[in-house]
């Protein structure tokens, strides 16, 4: 029997990862990323961040070459292709599909004043009711900056797109996007259920600048003859799924239905929950986007909480307090200290402005230290507790929006490798933590299987998803966890 594979790409700002999954058993056959160091981000001015889209394409080709060599797969063995990508990045092309300027990526802040002015001029309530967010620093505002500062270049733009749309264009020669993609760029009107003409008109954009909309799970385009020859793929292979990295992480964890939660805890941390009705936070402390399975007939919204000071704080503590031990030993050191860290509290917001704090930049602070009582173990535990407390602080906003948080799905990676972190999150939130063996590029591959009709639904696609651990709340220590969280929130009131 011939091998049957699905191919997934994950276009990040640090690398592009590719994975092959076996259609029949769901296993990852091969995966690789390129480059093996952090990809460059250009910062011509403070607060700017740009990348050359051609670099993404080159890195995709090189990572694909690695997995094809590792697996021995042939182009005709690949039945469908899916794409995950860094959200919010702006790619501009002309009528010949030539990139006009470097992509303004997610962490570039130059467009903030454009989004803030639009929010004020159009009316905050109006924007929230229709976009579910402030226009903020998202893709539409980035394009407004280009129009204002590079007018001659703007006049040459035929289409704009997101990083995943760009990779699909290079594979197929066709420019497409999704409702989920438009929503993450603040270009989808949830009331009218069509592109947000009012915002396009406000910024002076013609609607024709948007790519044609295709369903997230569908045969969106196929591999062109030119791309097939360049990559060793089969011409006509369906490109049948694309989603931003956070919706895709949820997809990878089989999080599709209202009340289901996905989380990541890398350099920054994310809690992403699915709502079954249109809702938003009036203060925009969390963002609401169309989830991957949103359609004009089915409301499935992804509510995204981001905490910038997550793994970056843990790494800072390791570097400055425990450089002589491994992360695993550091976790053991923290576990030697009681819940609440004997009164030491860390406010973890030292990685820029935090949206959950209404974009305030308050910095990180360590509080309650006694030179006669505390040591580095207290600081290590307080750091992990502070990260968890900030997650729970944001999850309270999500609960106010109607989300019932009973289970949190996560990959067993980054901060979720720490038993203390997991136990504290379960203890404070009262939710059961389920850890899975998962990967963004493999999730995109399985998403492609759904979109191409190879799998009948997401339950079949992710039937092989391996559950590695289940962490239930420790009811015996629940009051101690909640007391520590309450004391931390008292410190928050002093900010």
Show where each model-derived region lies.
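Short beta-strand-loop/turn "lid" adjacent to the catalytic site in phosphate-handling enzymes
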Residues: 47, 69-106, 132-137, 168-189, ...
